[in-house]
Amino acid sequence: MMRTQCLLGLRTFVAFAAKLWSFFIYLLRRQIRTVIQYQTVRYDILPLSPVSRNRLAQVKRKILVLDLDETLIHSHHDGVLRPTVRPGTPPDFILKVVIDKHPVRFFVHKRPHVDFFLEVVSQWYELVVFTASMEIYGSAVADKLDNSRSILKRRYYRQHCTLELGSYIKDLSVVHSDLSSIVILDNSPGAYRSHPDNAIPIKSWFSDPSDTALLNLLPMLDALRFTADVRSVLSRNLHQHRLW
């Protein structure tokens, strides 16, 4: 009897210790994500020289088209048996939407440095969201990323895409007729197959907290706004190079 009680007590202690350890790991991961997301990031925006100001005045203000899923954020929803993020990783925000009369919760994770990225590029470009997701979901995500800054006002959704061979194609002429001034940032090459010379490829992001792809793009986007035609740069076999 004594032995049985000892075994039960040991099992209870082990179970409690396991739960305590899991909770500790959860808190640690959350803290690491917070530190990485909000660590001091430097990309100094220096005053333009007279020559640079003159050059920028001679070209049109460019449009930067931004994809959402796996480019700026990653999400999974209720009922996903194998979520693509590590168990216990807290989402940055949770969305509750109704799809086909059924409430669905989306757990959304922001790509590292996305807030800083949007703050910087919004000073250089007119920003446009173009996602193959449904509007009820994409609009809610864009609202969260915009965070009342009014930098993501123009938005296009699945109904603005063309479905070809099971893939959603994004026609940039829907955004603007002058393709010389449009850049699209998207993790899916199929999405911009009609406009490869306007695209900047970026690797898909799911959960890596050390990802710096958005930061790596800032120097290029800074320089690209001075061109008369973005295709003169982006057509140079960029898609054969390493992804950002």
UniProtKB/Swiss-Prot annotation:
Transmembrane segments: 7-29
Species of origin: Homo sapiens (Human)
Family recorded in the similarity comment: Belongs to the dullard family.
UniProt xrefs under Gene3D superfamilies: HAD superfamily/HAD-like (3.40.50.1000)
Main location, first listed in the record: endoplasmic reticulum
Tissues with expression: Muscle specific with lower expression in other metabolic tissues.
Subcellular location: Endoplasmic reticulum membrane; Nucleus membrane
GO biological process, alphabetically ordered: canonical Wnt signaling pathway; gamete generation; mesoderm development; mitotic nuclear membrane disassembly; nuclear envelope organization; positive regulation of canonical Wnt signaling pathway; positive regulation of triglyceride biosynthetic process; protein dephosphorylation
Functional description taken from the UniProt entry: Serine/threonine protein phosphatase forming with CNEP1R1 an active phosphatase complex that dephosphorylates and may activate LPIN1 and LPIN2. LPIN1 and LPIN2 are phosphatidate phosphatases that catalyze the conversion of phosphatidic acid to diacylglycerol and control the metabolism of fatty acids at different levels. May indirectly modulate the lipid composition of nuclear and/or endoplasmic reticulum membranes and be required for proper nuclear membrane morphology and/or dynamics. May also indirectly regulate the production of lipid droplets and triacylglycerol.
Bilayer topology term: Single-pass membrane protein
Gene: CTDNEP1
pH-activity relationship: Optimum pH is 5.5.
GO molecular function, one term: phosphoprotein phosphatase activity
Short name of any one Pfam family annotated for the protein: NIF
Annotated Gene Ontology cellular component terms: cytoplasm; endoplasmic reticulum membrane; lipid droplet; Nem1-Spo7 phosphatase complex; nuclear envelope; nuclear membrane
EC number(s) stated in the UniProt entry for this protein: 3.1.3.16
UniProt keyword annotations, A-Z: Endoplasmic reticulum, Host-virus interaction, Hydrolase, Membrane, Nucleus, Protein phosphatase, Transmembrane, Transmembrane helix
Protein name: CTD nuclear envelope phosphatase 1
Limits of the FCP1 homology domain: 57-224
